């Protein structure tokens, strides 16, 4: 992976609330022959079944969904603010219709195992898919975190 170094997930100092909710990210899946990416601003990170995990929600209608479904790995790439326009484009246009790499100028890169991410990212999470579930409105509990006591 270019100039990136592997770190323990617990060494990530940024707030997951800021990284995903405020800064946004690109979720990318596929291989060096064909991949797609889309902007995410929903998701989180934590511990599941004793392992560090990151998760996001992708509607089945999204082109990236096909890539996530057909591959065991995906990446979450986080960027500095100067890439906001690229993230806006990747969240509003479909890879079925445009070449997002050409339109944004972002540089695709690949892990040793061929998992796609973007070289301009400040942080990349390489994620192995361990669970997927279709959501329906009955399975969502709307408890916001507006009351936090410390």
Model-predicted segments: where are they?
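Active-site-proximal mixed secondary-structure blocks
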Residues: 1-148
């Amino acid at each position: 992976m270019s100039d990136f170094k592997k770190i323990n997930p617990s060494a990530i100092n940024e707030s997951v609330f800021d990284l995903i909710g405020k800064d946004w990210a690109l979720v990318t899946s596929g291989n060096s022959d064909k991949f797609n990416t889309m902007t995410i601003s929903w998701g989180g990170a934590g511990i599941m079944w004793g392992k560090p995990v990151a998760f996001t929600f992708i509607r089945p209608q999204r082109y990236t969904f096909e890539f996530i479904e057909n591959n065991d790995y995906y990446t979450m790439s986080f960027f500095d603010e100067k890439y906001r326009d690229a993230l806006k484009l990747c969240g509003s246009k479909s890879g079925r219709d445009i070449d997002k790499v050409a339109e944004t100028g972002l540089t695709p890169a690949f892990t040793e195992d061929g998992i796609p991410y973007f070289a301009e990212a400040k942080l990349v999470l390489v994620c192995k898919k361990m669970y997927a579930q279709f959501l329906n409105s009955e399975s969502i509990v709307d408890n916001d975190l507006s009351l936090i006591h410390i």
